[in-house]
Amino acid sequence: MDLASRYKGVVGMVFGDNQSSNEDSYIQRLLDRISNGTLPDDRRTAIVELQSVVAESNAAQLAFGAAGFPVIVGILKDQRDDLEMVRGALETLLGALTPIDHARAQKTEVQAALMNSDLLSREAENITLLLSLLEEEDFYVRYYTLQILTALLMNSQNRLQEAILTTPRGITRLMDMLMDREVIRNEALLLLTHLTREAEEIQKIVVFEGAFEKIFSIIKEEGGSDGDVVVQDCLELLNNLLRSSSSNQILLRETMGFEPIISILKLRGITYKFTQQKTVNLLSALETINMLIMGRADTEPGKDSNKLANRTVLVQKKLLDYLLMLGVESQWAPVAVRCMTFKCIGDLIDGHPKNRDILASKVLGEDRQVEPALNSILRIILQTSSIQEFVAADYVFKTFCEKNTEGQTMLASTLIPQPHPTSRDHLEDDVHMSFGSMLLRGLCSGEADGDLETCCRAASILSHVVKDNLRCKEKALKIVLESPMPSMGTPEPLFQRIVRYLAVASSMKSKEKSSTLGKSYIQQIILKLLVTWTVDCPTAVQCFLDSRHHLTFLLELVTDPAATVCIRGLASILLGECVIYNKSIENGKDAFSVVDAVGQKMGLTSYFSKFEEMQNSFIFSPSKKPPQGYKPLTRTPTPSEAEINEVDEVDEMVKGNEDHPMLLSLFDASFIGLVKSLEGNIRERIVDVYSRPKSEVAVVPADLEQKSGENEKDYINRLKAFIEKQCSEIQNLLARNAALAEDVASSGRNEQSQGSEQRASTVMDKVQMESIRRELQETSQRLETVKAEKAKIESEASSNKNMAAKLEFDLKSLSDAYNSLEQANYHLEQEVKSLKGGESPMQFPDIEAIKEEVRKEAQKESEDELNDLLVCLGQEESKVEKLSAKLIELGVDVDKLLEDIGDESEAQAESEED
Amino acid sequence: MSYAYLFKYIIIGDTGVGKSCLLLQFTDKRFQPVHDLTIGVEFGARMITIDNKPIKLQIWDTAGQESFRSITRSYYRGAAGALLVYDITRRETFNHLASWLEDARQHANANMTIMLIGNKCDLAHRRAVSTEEGEQFAKEHGLIFMEASAKTAQNVEEAFIKTAATIYKKIQDGVFDVSNESYGIKVGYGGIPGPSGGRDGSTSQGGGCCG
Ligand SMILES: Nc1nc2c(ncn2[C@@H]2O[C@H](COP(=O)(O)OP(=O)(O)O)[C@@H](O)[C@H]2O)c(=O)[nH]1
Ligand SMILES: [Mg+2]
């Protein structure tokens, strides 16, 4: 932004103003006294006066601006020895750059401080000058200089970052300030925090200059998480350095290690009191941990190794223990801290099988009161009064179960119904309760007191346990629960019990409809479980359809105007799963019957429209923001406030929507992906089923003929019966056709008001017509291909015949050749035999003679060589003998020496082989 | 993680001479023929042993382009060692050595140890700078010299270790005040806190606390 031109305009305006012009001439006079005065004392008084005037009013700051800077900079440059003048100059400068509070009242007024910052930072030289002042002895000089730099940074960040970067040793000087007296150190900390915001190169240089060591030593000095706001500043600086730089993350890991940051999370003894500052400090440290867990903000594909290495090292350094202590065992930690802790635990094990196993093996508590950490987390989920905490802890199970068949199986293996508790013992009292028992207890807690909240949280966990795991699904399907009142009713499968709770929840909801009492997520979460469970699982479909009421209820739910978009959508998906995963052939329970029921209840158009409505809702829309965005903590927030803010923000986004905002986090990307893919499959399959009604009457042309021996009457009766059956089928089809026509007509009626439905219906028609046309086309194509195939096979057969003849011929000539070869071989063998036997020695005289000659020659040659070698060896041996004698004279253990030499040469030979 | 000394290195030289490859070969023992241009500065670290003492090397790999010079200069002063690299197959990278050296002399501390590396010596058939010329340049400017290949790993270990050994020797000879971290040296556990500290038995303030 170019403020200079505006500045001129404003100055002009100010000059036009009488009062200001007075001020201006006053300042002019002061500046004159400062630069041209001869009496040192007078100059000092003048600068003190100037300083107080400038600090007071916006107008004075404006008037000071362009004229004042050269004078002040001159003092700083050339009169360093006059400490008082330098101090005064710096204070004046600071005054000119600090916005005056009551100036805000007059909104039209130009912010003089802003313009002055702009003027001053325009010259990089000025910044260099200021940085050089940091080396002055005087405390105040350094202190004011830091404040001036901070003020400039706040107003013209980029320019200052650049200027400091290009000043040789500029950053070094600032870093040195961290080792200065406390007041200066704190000031420097703030400055560096601003300086490192979104400036990667500065971040790296700051780290190069040893920032990590300095930061952690300050944190330690200040008492870790118990320290004051300085600790928070330190952590903010640290987070700036680590947020987007994998290079800096590696450096921390490879040099200081992660212990210093992890140890900030360590609670000393039992902590009862979490002050606001301590909470903020812990949250900041958890943010650091989270950055390390997530690697760089924008994950490049190749740089995944950094992220994984971070996760491994963090767990090696016992981070999990501290997190569990903070999030699970410490009952006094504020909810915000506990939530952040769960998020970190979840991310730490996400896609990291080893860390997952370590978490699974962790136990908490002491002596006999130990229990697996996962059980403790489950208990928190079931019992916490905070929805945020439930969602955060739920995330741990989500990441634990994802692509972890073994872990899911381990959790599911304990899903064994306990005999009904006689006295209602409390969950918290029994650390010996298995994971599965606790989960089942949670699931059934609706039975006793209609506590569907706990039930739905348990349902959420169960959906992680069965997700994508057919064995766990089957296992859970086999669970049969006793009837709450044994006298009434029979035992009930878990799956059906959960469907029943869904029904209870929806009836409760419709009763409470008039009350504006908050949004609920109970039905959605239970539906999520049922949808997840039923995927790829015909047994679940069967179990669902075992009771005719279920289908009726689900159809009601899909069309229930009181239900939310999301509930209706998920119910439709569940309904669709009853079609696509239906393996039943039983009348009334097969895929066709379900489709039929849908068609009769609401019509396919209206059914499909539920999907679209849901996909358009905020939870499914792709524009939904990732739930984990970077949000800096302000310097003095109250944690509870921060939480409220967060919820508010989400609320803002979903205004006018009936679904609970927490579903944003609970419906993770993989679930949303699942729903989308299911939707596609369902549409396809339903059209398929609908367009091919199974025929009740098999038409076999031969049946229509009079059978031999059949008399006319019987024949006619048979035909009559046949025609009756066909007639009823035609009636049936006509009725269906009418329903479909009505569906089309009614969607046509809604055409004007509801474009989307109309579109859906024409899409439907098109799809059906398309499928018929396709079938026709396919059949004729098939005919063509069959014909072509026949021709091909025929020609193939004839060519094969030819081939066979040829092969036969070949075989014959081959066998002839073989025979003659064998004959030749036989002759040769005979010859060899006779040669060996010496029966005909003169048959090949030349060869024998030559062979003999060559043999002799070779023998002679090798003999010669051997002789040479022997001579050499003899020489060597005598040498060794001589040397040995000499060495013995000198007192050396010759045998040992010779042995060593042997070993060495062996070793050498070996290594040469490598 | 504990070390007797920590040395900071920088790697400088024209773009494309193989600085990043040398660092990768040294820290990860691998060669990556195609990789991104270094933007600004990248970091690597490794532990070595000299005189039976564990020594941690922190290495900053800089970008060679002119536009990054002002940034990379910030790293000179705090470095104990510099690897100045040229490419034996590209004459101009050798010709630029003087300007790099000038930069280093101007911004680095006077005791910085500089190792001149003629890289890509595996490409002997494309050689454009003879070994003797490299030697001669090093001799004239008081540098240590080696030809190396980041591709075959030839002399890569040696170059980094020889530099460290030289720095180590300088410490033993009392050239540095090692309590002053601006020389790019830090004393950890088991390191001698410099000759002066050794004599009067006090340990230096700067080192050892955070190993
Ligand atoms: N043959 C060969 N190629 C190398 C060697 N070192 C680096 N290179 C190649 O030279 C190019 C530049 O390397 P790089 O490390 O990015 O250079 P930098 O700009 O100095 O960091 C890359 O294509 C490398 O594959 C080496 O020792 N031998
Ligand atoms: Mg590079």
Swiss-Prot record, chain A:
Residue ranges the record marks as coiled coil: 723-837, 863-901
Modified positions (Phosphoserine) in chain numbering: 911
Swiss-Prot/TrEMBL keywords: Coiled coil, Golgi apparatus, Phosphoprotein, Protein transport, Transport
UniProt signal peptide: none
Compartments, record wording: Golgi apparatus; Golgi apparatus, Golgi stack
Biological role: Golgi matrix protein playing a role in tethering of vesicles to Golgi membranes and in maintaining the overall structure of the Golgi apparatus. Functions in the anterograde transport of storage protein precursors from the endoplasmic reticulum (ER) to the Golgi complex.
Domain remarks: The C-terminal domain (689-914) is necessary and sufficient for Golgi targeting.
Protein name: Golgin candidate 6
Gene behind the chain: GC6
UniProtKB/Swiss-Prot annotation, chain B:
Coiled coil ranges: none
Membrane topology annotation: Lipid-anchor
Gene Ontology molecular function terms on file: GTP binding; GTPase activity
Subcellular location: Cell membrane
GO cellular component, one term: plasma membrane
Listed PROSITE patterns: RAB
SMART domains: RAB (SM00175), RAN (SM00176), RAS (SM00173), RHO (SM00174)
Disulfide bond keyword on record: no
Residues given in the record as GTP binding sites: 13-21, 61-65, 119-122, 149-151
SUPFAM superfamilies: P-loop containing nucleoside triphosphate hydrolases
CDD domains: Rab2 (cd01866)
Record PTM N-acetylserine, positions in chain: 2
GO biological process, one term: protein transport
Keywords per UniProt: Acetylation, Cell membrane, GTP-binding, Lipoprotein, Membrane, Nucleotide-binding, Prenylation, Protein transport, Transport
Residues bearing a lipid moiety (S-geranylgeranyl cysteine): 209-210
Cysteine-cysteine disulfides: none
Motif (Effector region): 35-43
Superkingdom: Eukaryota
Family named by the database record: Belongs to the small GTPase superfamily. Rab family.
Known function: Intracellular vesicle trafficking and protein transport.
Protein name: Ras-related protein RABB1c
Organism annotation: Arabidopsis thaliana
